[in-house]
Amino acid sequence: MSKYYPDISHHEKVTDWNKVIKACPFIITKATQGLTFIDPLLGTVIKECEKRKKPYWLYAYLNSGKELAQAKFLVETCRERVGKYFVGYILDVECKEGNNVAGVRDALKYISNLGYKSMIYTMYAQYTRYKSVIDKRPKNCAWWEARYGKNNGTYSKKYPTHKGVDFHQFTERGS
């Protein structure tokens, strides 16, 4: 049986927390983007997860350039907000322009040495670009890959991920 791990941000608001909490083993939510943006739902998601004892991950959507500084902004933004059910930090490295590979490597090393779990999120089509980072990621770091196929909200075996992926995002369509 598949498990669903929702990716929540100001783009995908939760309308029924009870339903989400019961259906999902953990929550993933956007915290920051770049060096200045803080997702307006960050506080609400953390509060709801802590109140309901639901594990949650926080991620930074990395704009191109200054990846380490963006990872530090993520941590500084979240450090005083997280609670007992916080799992770890995620770096979302899918921007169109592409992220600096060395910058992603440094940022991943930084978040992976904070005492929490870590994760890197990549797009299927960008695998070659980030392969060296993925292959040498720390032991406490999972790999989340987006490969949508038809992107109709339904999983299809016709669109597998790359070998070694821990979490497969098969749609950007919520339900």
Please report, for each region that a protein language model flagged, where it lies by residue.
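Short, aromatic/basic amphipathic alpha-helical patches
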Residues: 73-76, 106, 131-136, 156-159
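Short beta-alpha junction loops
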Residues: 64, 94-97, 123-127, 150
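Glycine-rich, charge-decorated loop segments at or immediately adjacent to ligand/cofactor-binding or catalytic sites
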Residues: 67-69, 126-138
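Substrate-binding cleft of extracellular glycoside hydrolase catalytic domains
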Residues: 1-22, 28-117, 140
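Short, well-ordered coil↔helix boundary/capping segments
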Residues: 101-102, 121, 157-161
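Aromatic-lined carbohydrate-recognition surfaces of secreted/lumenal glycan-active proteins
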Residues: 115-129, 143
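Functionally critical loop-and-helix segments that line ligand-binding/catalytic clefts
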Residues: 1-18, 25, 134-175
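Flexible, glycine-rich phosphate/dinucleotide-binding loops
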Residues: 35-36, 65, 127, 152, ...
